[in-house]
Curated annotation (Swiss-Prot):
Species for this entry: Aeromonas hydrophila subsp. hydrophila (strain ATCC 7966 / DSM 30187 / BCRC 13018 / CCUG 14551 / JCM 1027 / KCTC 2358 / NCIMB 9240 / NCTC 8049)
Protein name per its UniProtKB record: High frequency lysogenization protein HflD homolog
Gene Ontology cellular component annotations, sorted alphabetically: cytoplasm; plasma membrane
Family: Belongs to the HflD family.
Transmembrane domains' residue ranges: none
Membrane topology label: Peripheral membrane protein
Length: 204
C-alpha cells in the first residue's frame, strides 16, 4: 500500500472527523474536547512539511475520523449514517468550488494568519478564536455555495457558542478536503478503493 494512498486515507478521515463532530455538536451541544482541538488545530497548519503534520503528526488526532470512515464505507450497512455522508459530500463539493477562487483563497490565507497570531494570546478553544474561525467560514466559504444545512437540536443550534463550533468545524472539514485534493483524492477512489481504505482505517 503506497504512502500516498495512506496519506489520502488520512485526509479523508480528517473530513469524516470534522463531519462527525459537526453532527455531535449540533445534536448534543458539545463533543470530545480533545478531538475538537485536534480538528481545529489543522486549520492553522497552512504549510506542512509532510501531510501528517496537518494532524499534529499523529494518527490519534483523527481517531474519531477513522472510526467514522470504517462505519461509512464498511460492509455493515446498519452502521451507515446518511446525515454524516451528506456533510462529507457537501464539504468536498464546496471545496472544489473554493479551489477555483484564487481571490477567496488569498483572503482565506490572510484571515487564518490573523488567527494564528491571536492564538499567542488566547487558547484555541476560547470563544473569541472560535467566533473568528466561524466568521471565516460564514464570510468567505459559505457564500460560494451550495450552503451546507446542518441538522440538530434547536435548543443547542440557537446558542452562539454552538454555532461558532459548528462553523469552525466546517472550516476544519474544508481544510481536510484541501489536503485530500492536493494528495490526489477523488470520488472514484472512494468508490473503487473503499475496501482498502477501510482496512487501513481499522489500524488506527
Amino acid at each position: 500500500m503506497s504512502d500516498k494512498f495512506q496519506d489520502r486515507t488520512m485526509a479523508f478521515a480528517g473530513i469524516c472527523q470534522a463531519a462527525y463532530l459537526v453532527q455531535k455538536v449540533a445534536r448534543d451541544g458539545s463533543c470530545d474536547e480533545a478531538a475538537l482541538r485536534e480538528s481545529l488545530s489543522s486549520i492553522l497548519v497552512t504549510n506542512p512539511s509532510q501531510p501528517l503534520e496537518v494532524f499534529n503528526n499523529t494518527h490519534l488526532a483523527i481517531r474519531d475520523g477513522y472510526r467514522a470512515l470504517v462505519e461509512q464505507l464498511g460492509a455493515d450497512g446498519s452502521q451507515k449514517n446518511a446525515e454524516l455522508t451528506r456533510y462529507v459530500v457537501s464539504l468536498i463539493a464546496l471545496e472544489r468550488k473554493l479551489a477555483k477562487r484564487k481571490d477567496i483563497l488569498n483572503m482565506l490565507g490572510e484571515r487564518i494568519s490573523q488567527i494564528g497570531r491571536q492564538q499567542q494570546h488566547f487558547d484555541l478553544l476560547d470563544e473569541q478564536i472560535l467566533a473568528n474561525m466561524a466568521s471565516i467560514y460564514s464570510d468567505l466559504i459559505s457564500p460560494i455555495g451550495p450552503r451546507i444545512q446542518v441538522a440538530g437540536t434547536p435548543l443547542f443550534l440557537q446558542q452562539p457558542l454552538v454555532q461558532h463550533k459548528v462553523r469552525a468545524l466546517l472550516l476544519a472539514g474544508i481544510r481536510a478536503c484541501v489536503l485530500w485534493r492536493q494528495l490526489g483524492g477523488s470520488r472514484t477512489q472512494i468508490i473503487f478503493a473503499r475496501k482498502k481504505m477501510v482496512e487501513l482505517a481499522k489500524r488506527y
